[in-house]
Amino acid sequence: CWEQKEKVNKEAKLISSSSLCLTNLPNLWFGFESQNWVMNQKIVLEVVPWVDYKASRGWTKQNKKELETEITRLDFVSSLSKKEIFSGEFIDLIIGKYKYKEFKDLLPSEKANSIQNLAIQAVQNTKQMNDFLEFKRKTAWDFYKKNQHQKAIDYILKEIVDNKWAQAKDYSALGDIYIETKQFVKAKESYFKATQLDNNQLWYQLKYANALVFNEDISEAKEIHKKYKSNNIDVKTSWIQQAKFDIDFYKSKGLNVDDFKKILRILD
């Protein structure tokens, strides 16, 4: 099935599995012809198996396009600043873990789980976790704007907190929703976690103090206000301005703000 008519000394030849004579072949024979009838002669044949690793995994250019389709189904991809880099990394992770047939044979639940895990890994590898988390936060915020408070809470807990990605701003957002829904104990706990993660952001300290008032821990709240009332929350907003704004906001949401009168005496 294959013949080398030219005389050879040391030469490597590649016989591909695509050769018809190698299909379902139990044995492979090599024959040599020599016209040397006088001198002693030794023929050394070395057979080295060679496998095209990438080709053997079955991922053709067309097959990879199926992965591009999977990428379009990932809801967060549009929020990434480096989409192309993410896509390339995601495809590399998939084809590195699975042969094409293995990937196709996965159960739908197995495939969905693997895609989710490898997509997150691709986000991390391409250093785009901030974009990814901002998408999650925006999704929760959209629930909140539609007054779907429980959905917003559940989304933050499941998508961010449970995955150990939560930052101070995430616990602060939880605290805000807990306050509006009169879950004051949970609000206090969430704001406290925010202050632990970022104790330099006075906004979290103020929110924690507000939660203390709703929990009737007035004395502790007063101490926080006394400590920070001469500070600014940011470049333009003072602690006192923000504190009064918060009280008005709570009142607009129908919350009882009577206990805040005790706080206002400290601020005025």
Residues covered by each model-derived region:
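Surface-exposed beta-strand/loop patches in noncatalytic accessory domains
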Residues: C1-S18
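Short coil turns that delineate tetratricopeptide repeat
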Residues: K164-W165, N199, I233
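Terminal, low-structured helical/coil segments at or just beyond the last alpha-helical repeat
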Residues: D234-D268
